[in-house]
Amino acid sequence: ILKSGDYIKDKYSCDYLVIGTGAGGSVAGTLLAEKGCDVVFIEEGGYFPTSSFNNKVGDMTAKLYRNRGISPLIGKPLVALAEGRCVGGGTVINGEGLFRTPKRILDEWQQDYGLMGYSYANLEGHFQKVERDLNVESKSISSEKNTNLDSQKLIEGAKKLNWRTEFVPRAAKNCQYTNSCSIGCPTGAKQSTLVSYLPRAIDAGAKIFSDCRVTKIIHSKGTAHYAIAEVIVKNKKHKIKIYFNYLVIAGGAIQTPHLLKKSNMSKNAGKKLEFHMNVKVIARFPESIYADKGTMFPVQIHEFENEDCYINTSAVKPSYLAM
């Protein structure tokens, strides 16, 4: 793993260049590396191992998030977007829920848009493989005293209203219920790509260029040739070139189209962007909920699933909620 200050050359080369180390890029690059391919990952953010994670919200959001936690999307309404920017990407800061694409959505893609080969039957084996790789389970919530009390309250309320609840499939192994999912799991229980796919890729010979921001893809006649990236050398910005035979751009729904547009590779990139809104409701209870003992949304209300609405709890620390 190359970090800021490690870049001693102006030019690098590889067979496969993968831009992004989150949920998309890490899987693609790992599978290629394990097939014997020469793979280089590029990550704009820094490399922060599990041992560096602490319980300080301000410190960890500054390290793991783009713009220290909040990127405002200007429009009506004004939306606060949270993006991961570190080795492991958004998987390091998400809530470890891992959902299969619903069958009704896959059916819609096939029936309304003619997208063949992506039926539930086609994808089920792939879903199962990823779930095995990430130790996914959705059994129950912790029975330990004063743990996940927010989710217990959600279940109690749903029962009174006769609403359907489901346990969330979680990519976690031996969860210690520190409720630090959103600022980096300090125990390594959450199976982010930082602790799951990327170590496999490195073991297979892949390299990771961290603190390395791709600014442009150089291409001609429909073929991409090399990437121009910015790194820090002796406290100054320095440009390097990475040549490749094959390119995977996996910078997420925001950064991927942004890079494609900057590189004049696509006029339509980003025009069909959609994202789900999180609407927060804050509740006060007469008894303690112990936000430090639990994990993010192990249970959801699925009563309104067909209306594209889930309800879950997130007993985050006050300093994180303030964001």
Please report, for each region that a protein language model flagged, where it lies by residue.
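Conserved beta-strand-loop-beta-strand element in the redox core of flavoprotein oxidoreductases
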Residues: 216-241, 247
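N-terminal FAD cofactor-binding segment of flavoenzymes
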Residues: 37, 44-93, 101-104, 151-155
